[in-house]
From Swiss-Prot:
NCBIfam families associated with the record: pyruv_ox_red
Keyword annotations of the record: 4Fe-4S, Electron transport, Iron, Iron-sulfur, Metal-binding, Nitrogen fixation, Oxidoreductase, Repeat, Transport
Classification via InterPro entries: 4Fe4S_Fe-S-bd (IPR017896), 4Fe4S_Fe_S_CS (IPR017900), PFOR_II (IPR033412), Pyruvate:ferred/Flavod_OxRd (IPR050722), Pyrv-flavodox_OxR_EKR_sf (IPR037112), Pyrv-flavodox_OxRtase_EKR (IPR019456), Pyrv/ketoisovalerate_OxRed_cat (IPR019752), Pyrv_Fd/Flavodoxin_OxRdtase_N (IPR002880)
Gene expressing this chain: nifJ
Cofactor note: Binds 3 [4Fe-4S] clusters per subunit.
Organism: Nostoc sp. (strain PCC 7120 / SAG 25.82 / UTEX 2576)
Induction of synthesis: By iron deprivation.
PANTHER family the UniProt entry points to: PYRUVATE-FLAVODOXIN OXIDOREDUCTASE-RELATED (PTHR32154:SF0)
Any GO BP: nitrogen fixation
Protein's recorded name: Pyruvate-flavodoxin oxidoreductase
Functional note: Oxidoreductase required for the transfer of electrons from pyruvate to flavodoxin, which reduces nitrogenase.
Length: 1199
């Protein structure tokens, strides 16, 4: 039988099988499982049939609960159906899983296992989610590798048909779902050989049909429910043996044999680890290493977790075992032990006697000691060093039980110590690491490299990619291994023989060379040439190069990319350098393979994109140069080396928590933090992003004072609040740095004052949106404006000083600003700054504006999504506070309940204000009727009103302190009032999130909240896709757009959420687009917050998922409005009370066609290449629908 190999990740490995074996696939995106649904949707779009020759129906639902419901319905009517999920998504499915499992329905749900949100959200892998489903009645089959995930997907589908027990097939999120490995693919005949078609016919025979009507899903009473529930026992009792039989048959077919409980190790092992998931591979590798050196250890891999087979499990254990460590990748606080540990203890307690075939344990085989431990939560590293520490613990006379490994628990002292230098990796494996920016294509190029080596040679290949949670512009670290033997190393590289650093700034922030092995090759993308780079390298980097005798090569990849017309995409260039230096393939062969990959990868994007990439390849090697290392300098800086080792990366002005805790996380040393340093409830300070100084921009904006008209549009659109304006008295310039710029203020309200626009050089991302929107042009040089981009590196030091000086200039009094004028409103201090959002992000300008206007009194409920990640992901937070210590209070609950969560804020704030008012009235004699009346009747509509109310509350507190408190009841009332008094100052509740949240998963919640009539403000940042999970379609996605889950183009019209909200009549509704009409956006925010009732602002937000140049995102917003694809309007119920039409259209009739604006975005253009006839048809429909919608709104606004 011929073997077919492919280099794929776990998600694709599973999806390939699941797609072949199902007819209806209901999907919903959630990291890290989304790619399984994306593959299924893409294959459906290309018309790929399943095993029986029909193309499955792949349907996106509004939530994971919806997907489970759809699958349940499909199963009940006889289809083969599946879904994919993880984490909170699995929790939403659990009610349906109980039903599906209880009805003995054949189906498989595939889970990329992930942490559940507890004290914090985490998108990374562990078994928290699947363990929450272990009582559903689903069998649970666990894969440990990419190959196993491919194989077990088939075994699970075969087993569910043969057993009628529903199956949950899970594998570790990221470590398996995203790890790229060379795997042997299952042929259709392999798949067909395991599927019993008679069982499929039986499944269909059980379907609900009016041709043979049945009733299922009854309500039962106490007299029979218990008995009926026990009736399923025979199915579960038979299940393990059936699964093992299928595994045996699979082995005969493929040569890959599996056991439901599989032992590997010494036949006479005295110590044993029991484990599930990708950790099995690491333990397997370590067991082989230790046994080769005289140890007697083993590993038992648990494949079938449910139903548990006591007899088979105990028989799999070696008779010689004396001590067992059970490792769980989850934490269940308050339990007697984690799930796998408890099952093992129970199984051995019940089964060990039978193992020895005697009524009591024999002397030769005493019951082993069993201890449990936790490892790997939220993808925490699990290395051979940690495995060895577990075995060493087992060797102790009294081993530590309920231990943790991989952390330093200095609070409850559960952790085991381990030697991080212990390694099991063979020397003949190529280990390469690449440090890249999230937007530079490094990860994509490395995936191509793996395919080139894995599929073009006999070598095995492994790729794993580590991301920080910043968006585009984040740091990515790619870990690639190549070798002649299968690679089991499911952990990060710590001894690399090749390191590529693709961004110069990383050398200043991160210990890039710590993982370099002695004599390794270093490739550096450098703005300095080979002759000058040495003197510009940070001292610590030079010391490491000398100490480890590293070889250094440099290339100015950014310059090569610019010369080739590729902008900031340096991936192909650095890939060529890697193959030239690493010697994995002959250079000529490697370059030929790279060019083939370019044509395949970028062919859909057009001939020009392919040409530019090919040109970059041809120009690369002539620009690659080796650096001569001055060996004579070794030992020159011994004193400096000692100094550097004790130096904090942050200034002493940073708070201690920032320096000692967040600072470690910022430089990727968070693994070293002990338990005691971290808040146990997940509460963190705000205002910490200002300390990060990422320095990711190659170019920053420079202000031209002679051209500027002081409109502040550049300030308003800046996604990262990195460019700001101030007016101030000339006397403030007395100690200004010599390069600090200022001009006379042009606004007559600031006569005789100075005006400055200043950029934060180390916080700017270089998106250039400020330049794009600047209306002021240099008449003598039309290509220049009042803001122009220039290289950051030469400007960094002087602009850092200028920024520090600028921050110390006084902010204008908020009470004196005309907030309806952008040039004055943008003088307000933003309380959202330097987020991890993409360069050029379309969402963050709205969030920033919100905080400028209302941040000092706002409480934010943030739906999970892009905004919760760039707004609330460690290490730093962009939400900040003003000099008075006031600022937005922020929290994230879940994706599916954010509207209700924020509604809870409002209920609480109103109740506390009500209680405070009740108490206040009881003290009118003590504090004075005038003060009480002025507080209770304060209008609180303007900045001045808010300021005055705060003064009254301060006076109230002072008066309360003067009241004698001999009476305990009186003292309690005073304490209560003092604790609640601040709630008598108006608080602004904002419920924010993206369109996936608002249009889909929590639409019901939003509907309920706005129907309540309560005073909440909802901001929907509409990117028209699920941006956070990678750009999947939502009900906000417009017709004809290609998105993940809509690979054939979205056939349905965009949901008109604003119209739905207007139907209530008592809701303020606005549709805005900052790039189209900034003053209308400002009006909408002011009116929404002022409206005493529910308000919703739907804000168009351009996104990288649209396939646009983000620099021109604001232009795209304008084009959208001019074509009528996006409407600008405000619906204000207060106007109705004045006898006016509440709906105001804030735009003219469309002046360009839908086609003109659509085809500026790749998400629409893609369809014209892949399905031109479909694209033409959908375009015509889209134009007709835009025209009809415009006419309807015109009619409604003119009544």
């Amino acid at each position: 039988m011929s073997q077919t190999f492919a280099t794929i990740d776990g998600n694709e490995a599973v999806a390939r099988v699941a797609y072949k074996l199902n007819e209806v696939i209901a999907i919903y995106p959630i990291t890290p499982s989304s790619a399984m649904g994306e593959w299924a949707d893409a294959w459906m779009a290309e018309g790929r049939p399943n095993l029986w020759g029909t193309v499955p129906s792949v349907v996106q639902m509004q939530s994971e609960g919806g997907a489970a419901g759809a699958v349940h319905g499909a199963l009940q009517t006889g289809s083969l159906s599946t879904t994919f999920t993880a984490s909170q998504g699995l929790l939403l499915m659990i009610p349906n899983l109980y039903k599906i499992g209880g009805e003995l329905t054949s189906m498989v749900v595939h889970v990329a296992a992930r942490s559940l949100a507890t004290h914090a959200l985490s998108i990374f892998g562990d078994h928290s989610d699947v363990m929450a489903a272990r009582g559903t009645g689903f069998a649970m089959l666990c894969s440990a590798s990419v190959q196993e995930s491919h194989d077990f997907a088939l075994i699970a589908h075969a087993a569910t048909l043969d057993t009628r027990v529903s199956f949950l097939h899970f594998f570790d999120g990221f470590r398996t779902s995203h790890e790229v490995q060379k795997v042997e693919l299952l042929a259709d005949d392999d798949v067909r050989s395991l599927i019993n078609e008679d069982k499929i016919f039986a499944h269909r025979a059980r379907a609900l049909t009016p041709d043979s009507p049945l009733l299922r899903g009854t309500a039962q009473n106490p007299d029979v429910f218990f008995q009926a529930r026990e009736g399923a026992n025979p199915y579960y009792n038979a299940c393990p043996a059936i699964v093992q039989g299928i595994m045996d048959k699979f082995g005969e077919r493929t040569g890959r044999y599996y056991q439901i409980y599989e032992y590997h190790g010494a036949s006479d092992a005295d110590r044993l680890i029991i484990i599930m998931g990708s950790g099995c591979e690491t333990v397997h590798e370590t067991v082989d290493y230790l046994n080769a050196r005289g140890e007697k250890v083993g590993v038992l891999k648990v494949r079938l977790f449910r139903p548990w087979d006591v007899e088979r499990f105990v028989q799999a254990l070696p008779h010689s075992v004396q001590a067992i460590a059970v490792l769980d990748r989850t934490k269940e606080p308050g339990s007697a032990g984690e799930p796998l540990y408890q099952d093992v203890v129970t199984a051995i307690h019940e089964g060990w006697v039978n193992k020895n075939n005697s009524p009591v344990p024999s002397p030769q085989s005493p019951v082993p000691k069993i201890i449990g431990g936790r490892y790997g939560l939220s993808s925490k590293e699990f290395t051979p060093a940690m495995v060895k520490a577990v075995f060493d613990n087992l060797a102790q006379a009294t081993p530590k039980n309920h231990f943790t490994i991989g952390i330093n628990d200095d609070v409850t002292h559960t952790s085991l110590e381990y030697d991080p230098s212990f390694s099991t990796e063979p020397d003949n494996v190529v280990r390469a690491m690449f440090y890249g920016l999230g937007s530079d294509g490094t990860v994509g190029a490395n995936k191509n490299s793996i395919k080139i080596i894995g599929e073009g040679t006999d070598n095995y290949a492994q790729g794993y990619f580590v991301y920080d949670s910043k968006k585009s512009g984040s740091m990515t670290v790619s870990h690639l291994r190549f070798g002649s033997q299968p690679i089991r190393s499911t952990y990060l590289i710590d001894q690399a023989n090749f390191i590529g650093c693709h961004h110069w700034g990383f050398l200043e922030r991160i210990e890039v060379l710590n993982a370099a092995a002695h004599g390794a090759t270093i490739l550096l993308n450098s703005p300095y040439n080979a002759a000058t780079v040495w003197e510009n390298l940070p001292l610590k980097v030079r010391l490491q190069i000398l100490d480890k005798q590293l070889k250094l090569y440099v290339i100015n990849a950014n310059q090569v990319a610019r010369d080739s017309g590729m902008g900031g995409r340096i991936n192909t260039i650095m890939q060529v350098c890697f193959f030239a230096l690493a010697g994995v393939l002959p250079e000529v062969q490697a370059i030929a393979k790279i060019k083939q990959a370019i044509e395949k990868t970028y062919g859909k994007k057009g001939v020009e994109v392919v040409r530019m990439n090919l040109q970059a390849v041809d120009q690369t090697l002539e620009n690659l140069h080796e650096v001569k290392i001055p060996i004579e300098e070794k030992g020159k800086w011994i004193d400096e080396e000692a100094l550097l080792s004790n130096q904090s990366p942050f200034s002493t002005s940073a708070p201690k928590f920032v320096r000692d805790v967040l600072g470690k996380i910022m430089v990727w040393q968070g693994d070293d933090l002990p338990v005691s340093t971290l808040p146990p409830d997940g509460t963190f300070p705000t205002g910490t992003a200002k300390w990060e100084k990422r320095n990711v921009a190659q170019e920053i904006p420079v202000w031209d004072t002679d051209i500027c008209v002081q409109c502040s549009k550049c300030v308003m659109v800046c996604p990262h609040a990195a460019i700001r304006a101030k007016v101030y008295q000339p006397s403030e310039l007395e100690n200004a740095p010599p390069t600090f710029k200022s001009v006379d203020a042009k606004d007559r309200d600031f006569a005789n004052q100075k005006f400055t626009i200043q950029v934060a050089p180390e916080d700017c991302t270089g998106c250039a949106i400020c330049v794009n929107v600047c209306p002021a042009k240099n008449k003598s040089e039309p290509s220049l404006k009042a803001i122009n981009m220039a290289n950051q590196l030469p400007l960094r030091e002087q602009e850092r000083d200028n920024w520090d000086f600028f921050l110390n200039l006084p902010n204008p009094d908020r009470r004196n600003l005309k907030l309806n004028q952008i040039r004055q409103q943008q003088l307000q201090e933003p309380l959202f700054e330097f987020s991890g959002a993409c360069a050029g992000c379309g969402e963050t300008p709205y969030v920033k504006l919100l905080t400028q206007l209302f941040g000092d009194r706002s409480v934010i409920a943030n739906a999970t999504g892009c905004s919760s990640i760039y707004g609330g992901n460690l290490p730093t937070t962009p939400w900040t506070k003003n000099n008075d210590g006031r600022g937005p209070a922020w929290s994230n609950s879940l994706f599916e309940d954010n509207a209700e969560f924020g509604f809870g804020y409002r209920l609480s704030l109103d109740k506390q204000a009500e209680f405070a008012a009740e108490l206040l009235q009881q003290f009118s004699t003590e504090v004075g009727d005038n003060l009480v009346d002025s507080i209770l009747k304060a209008p609180q509509k303007t900045e001045a009103d808010i300021w005055e109310q705060r003064q009254r509350i301060e006076l109230l507190k002072q008066q309360l302190d003067k009241i004698p408190t001999f009476d305990p009841n009186l003292k309690s009332k005073i304490q209560n009032l003092k604790s609640l008094a601040d709630y008598l100052v108006k608080k602004s509740v904002w419920i924010i999130g993206g369109d996936g949240w608002a249009y889909d998963i929590d639409f019901g919640g939003i509907d309920h909240v706005i129907a309540s009539g309560r005073n909440v403000n909802i901001l929907v940042m509409d990117t028209e896709v699920y941006s956070n999970t990678g750009g999947q379609s939502s009900k906000a996605t417009p017709k004809a757009a290609v998105a993940k889950f809509a690979a054939s183009g979205k056939p349905a019209q965009k949901k008109d959420m604003g119209l739905m909200a207007m139907n209530y009549g008592n809701v303020y509704v606005a549709s805005v687009a900052l790039g189209a009409k900034d003053d209308q956006t400002l009006k909408a925010f002011l009116e929404a917050e002022a409206f005493d009732g529910p308000s919703i602002i739907i804000a168009y937000s351009h996104c990288i998922a649209h396939g646009i140049n983000m620099t021109t995102g604001m232009n795209q917003q304008k084009a959208l409005v001019e074509s009528g694809r996006w409407l600008l309007y405000r619906y204000n119920p207060l106007l109705q009370e004045q006898g006016k039409n509440p709906l105001q259209l804030d735009m003219r009739s469309p002046t360009q066609s839908v086609e003109q604006s659509m085809y500026q975005e790749n998400r629409f253009k893609m369809l014209t290449k892949s399905k031109p006839e479909v694209a033409k048809q959908l375009l015509e429909q889209a134009q007709a629908e835009v025209d009809a919608r415009w006419q309807m709104y015109q009619y409604l606004a003119s009544r």
